[in-house]
UniProtKB/Swiss-Prot annotation:
It comes from the Eukaryota. May be involved in the regulation of the cytoskeleton through interaction with the subpellicular microtubules. May be involved in parasite mobility and attachment to the surface of the host cell. Behaves as a strong immunogen during infection. Keywords: Cytoplasm, Cytoskeleton, Microtubule. SUPFAM superfamilies: C-terminal domain of PLC-beta. The keyword Cytoplasm applies. Belongs to the KMP-11 family. Monomer. InterPro entries: KMP11. GO terms for cellular component: cytoplasm; microtubule; microtubule cytoskeleton. This is Kinetoplastid membrane protein 11. One of its GO terms (biological process) is cytoskeleton organization. It holds the Pfam family KMP11.
């Protein structure tokens, strides 16, 4: 059975969403392990804040890149389907 563009796109979208959710869950677990802020020196508190911000920025960049790759794969798949259609039904 042939896969349609809609099926392929839906699967990539679902995988992107699942991966983003897993990344967010991992970040939450990681951030939950942070010591109580009242026990941290101002320097360590600043360090943790910078580190958390950096992790979130990298997560966001990674998720954006994953989405860009998915969009590229969708376009390539659509192109392949069009080529296949043209090969099967020339002149249509």
């Amino acid at each position: 059975m042939a896969t349609t563009l809609e099926e392929f796109s839906a699967k990539l979208d679902r995988l992107d969403a699942e991966f983003a959710k897993k990344m967010e869950e991992q970040n939450k677990k990681f951030f939950a392990d942070k010591p109580d802020e009242s026990t941290l020196s101002p320097e360590m508190k600043e360090h943790y804040e910078k580190f958390e911000k950096m992790i979130q920025e990298h997560t966001d960049k990674f998720n954006k890149k994953m989405h860009e790759h998915s969009e590229h794969f969708k376009a390539k798949f659509a192109e392949l389907l069009e080529q296949q259609k043209n090969a099967q039904f020339p002149g249509k």
